[in-house]
A protein has these predicted regions:
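Extended substrate/RNA-proximal surfaces in nucleic-acid metabolism proteins
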Residues: 1-168
Length: 169
């Protein structure tokens, strides 16, 4: 493990000091490739979770992408789409979520009172390790750190290491 608990070889990395404005052609090409890789990973996640949550299902293009500011969806956008789909399709979303999340109905009701907290519960139960949407990352699941460094430098920023607790390596 590096800095993603339970996911050996996965390394959260970041860049700092990105200037505003248009990016170079080199950076645009890398961004396009990363966007395609992320979208493919998200679509696969949606297929797995759709199978588990049926009949509550979402469409990545129709239900998830409109929730994003620039078409760059995260697990959190996907979770919001599922919560909205259950609200639209289920007569009692609390009963639905209690069944699908393996939780007591009262616990689900309490969690649902805090929108962000409930989103975290859904994400953790469905998309994180042990959940039906989770797949152990492989060597090609995420871009190599060298590609992220190249993007960061092409944008005129600085590549940086990220630490799990923000304090220690």
């Amino acid at each position: 493990e590096i800095n993603s608990p339970g996911e050996p070889g996965v390394y959260y990395h970041m860049g700092i000091g990105f200037p505003s404005g248009p990016v170079s052609a080199e950076a645009a090409a890398i961004l396009s490739e990363l966007h395609e890789q992320s979208a493919a990973r998200n679509r696969a996640l949606v297929r797995r979770v759709n199978a588990y949550l049926a009949p509550v299902e979402i469409d990545y293009e129709a239900d998830v992408l409109p929730l994003t500011p620039a078409g760059n969806a995260t697990e959190r956008h996907i979770v919001v789409a599922y919560i909205e789909a259950a609200r639209r399709k289920e007569p009692d979303p609390t009963v639905f979520w209690a069944d699908r999340l393996g939780m007591d109905r009262a616990a689900v009701q309490k969690a649902m009172a805090d929108s962000a907290g409930f989103q975290n519960v859904v994400r953790n139960k469905l998309m994180k390790k042990g959940g039906p949407g989770y797949v152990q990352p492989g060597h090609d699941t995420f871009p190599p750190v060298e590609k992220l460094n190249a993007l960061t430098v092409a944008c005129g920023a600085l590549p940086c290491a990220a630490w799990l607790d923000g304090l220690s390596p």
